[in-house]
Amino acid sequence: VTETTPSWEHANDETAPGLVIDYDASVWCEVPPMWVEEDWAELGTWSLRFSELCWEHEDPAPGDVEAYADQLRGAGEIAQAHAPGARALLYTPHPRARGPLTVLVDVLPAEDMEPAAALRLLTLADDDDAVRAPVVDAFPSPDLGDGLRVSRAIPGDEDGLFFQLRYAWYYEEYDAYVLMVTITHDLELLISAIPEIEYLAMSTRFLEPGEAEVMDE
């Protein structure tokens, strides 16, 4: 599935550059943005409909559909509360699998800072809160340009840890940054999802001029 929505701080502005994310709909679903007006955009309605679709070819026990819908709705509510302007995708390979795992993708206007320093700031590559030195790798994108990938562990509740992957790219044409973030306490879930997350990272791009009209035909 290739989805495109306006990006930028003014997400409803039709002149804003569109961000395209090519994802596998068999393992990902996208939380409807808060500004979408379709009747399914209310999280309770959306999560129940999506849960019913996920269980369609399975044999759910009583309450399974509703329980999975609650998980989806909870993840969507957290995403909308913490990053209301971002795209939120949930890693949902199977309704019985662990998760869902949320990946947020956002576009940020450039600040008065060198791109190399800004990428380190966005990815928290030098953050002192990490329990050990973050692992920092160059992660260039064929469409977005130079970027970084940072994996880090930070203190969580009750002496637990949160594990985080952060990607950021500088897109010179729009003088903007694309930021992709996921965080979870479930390291096994994160590791299992890394191939799909890496694919998301490499497939994210801006809509080319005139491409929207072609996609709508």
What do the PLM-derived regions correspond to, one by one?
Residues 1-162, 171-217:
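N-terminal targeting sequences that direct proteins away from the cytosol to non-cytosolic compartments
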